[in-house]
Amino acid sequence: MARNKRLAESLNGALHSLFERHSDLYLLGEDIVDPYGGAFKITKGLSTRFPDRVFTTPISENAIIGAAGGLALCGNRVIAEIMFGDFLALGFDQILNFATKTVSLYGGRKQMRLVVRCPVGGHRGYGPRTARTCRSTSSVSRTCRCTS
């Protein structure tokens, strides 16, 4: 009988599988390297196994998403890890005015293989500034999709 996995373990396993399959996949975010592995341990073990493709960043959501967008523009697959969904607004300029428009600026010839991943919602005791769900903000462009 298979044991029930926590969502964090499932996401971590999925990321490990993606990194094994795609040598052009990069991950950028705050505190995501080992031994910490991110606020929710989703990235645990990735920086040890793939040290050339997993990068911790300064606390600047705008810079994280901007750098990730630049890597994606160069043809790479990129995951930008934002610690909490509430902080997504700080990087929204890069999403709205760079990442989503780039596909149109190149007449559809360029792909932006960019995922901005962030946990949303509460129930963890981090307080009101890290508990909001920001799904409606990602429906501003036809090239931007939100899943949860």
Tell what function each PLM region has.
Residues M1-S148:
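Thiamine diphosphate
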